[in-house]
């Protein structure tokens, strides 16, 4: 009888052991999932956010801006870095709003070069001209950005970038980029043409890099809220 009771007690303890170990295994799995979620949140928080810029699922950065008082969004391009996309947005915003624009890089003197060379308070660029200026400004930023093999101070980088932007904007003046008065109609929706301030048609189609302009140049969308101009 004693031997049978001992066997019964031993078998019962063996059955109870997995039940006692289950809470620890569940707690370890929950802790691992929480730690992974924390890591993902930390990665997202480390990414600097710029106005007019969003990241796509495959890692590229896109920029677009809404034309004031219109349903039109102007596509500014797809870039390898958030900074380049933010530069494109800044230049486009300067074209639309002038000196009062709230920029991603307000301390950059290249913004003032743009205003001095192209803009005044009463002029606006056509949508595709804005696309071209923004894309070339972003490409200029990438061209003058320091590489890992070259060591330079931030002031040196700003100096080279400003020189590049100054040269870039000067080339647009030399090529007679169309400027139009803000009171005139700058785009004819019916005929798909841009207009000079005297109403003459202007079919502007710059040859942009296909890797930069991946989507439609601009498109209509009244319901989706876009980035604030303030």
Swiss-Prot record:
Q: Name one GO cellular component term.
A: nucleus
Q: Identify the stretch(es) annotated as Disordered.
A: 1-51
Query: Where is the protein situated, by its record's location annotation?
Result: Nucleus
CDD domains per UniProt = AP2 (cd00018)
- Give UniProt keywords alphabetically: Activator, DNA-binding, Ethylene signaling pathway, Nucleus, Stress response, Transcription, Transcription regulation
Q: What induces it?
A: Induced by jasmonate (JA) and ethylene. Down-regulated by freezing and heat stresses.
Function per UniProt:
Transcriptional activator involved in the regulation of plant development and tolerance to abiotic stresses. Involved in salt and osmotic stress response pathways. May be regulated by the stress-related genes RD29A, RD22, DREB1A or P5CS during stress response. Binds to the GCC-box pathogenesis-related promoter element. May be involved in the regulation of gene expression by stress factors and by components of stress signal transduction pathways.
Name the source organism: Arabidopsis thaliana
Q: Which parts of this chain does the entry mark as a DNA-binding region? A: 49-106
Ranges annotated as biased composition (Basic and acidic residues): 1-17
Tell me which InterPro entries the record gives.
Answer: AP2/ERF_dom (IPR001471), AP2/ERF_dom_sf (IPR036955), AP2/ERF_TF_ERF_subfamily (IPR051032), DNA-bd_dom_sf (IPR016177)
Q: Where is the composition biased (Basic residues)?
A: 40-51
Biological processes, Gene Ontology terms = cellular response to freezing; cellular response to heat; ethylene-activated signaling pathway; positive regulation of DNA-templated transcription; response to jasmonic acid; response to salicylic acid
**UniProt record similarity statement:** Belongs to the AP2/ERF transcription factor family. ERF subfamily.
Tell me yes or no: is Transcription regulation among this UniProt entry's keywords: yes
Q: What is this protein called?
A: Ethylene-responsive transcription factor ERF012
> Can you name one GO molecular function term for this protein?
DNA-binding transcription factor activity
Expressing tissues: Expressed cotyledons, ovules and seeds of immature siliques.
Question: Bias category Low complexity: which stretches?
Answer: 20-39
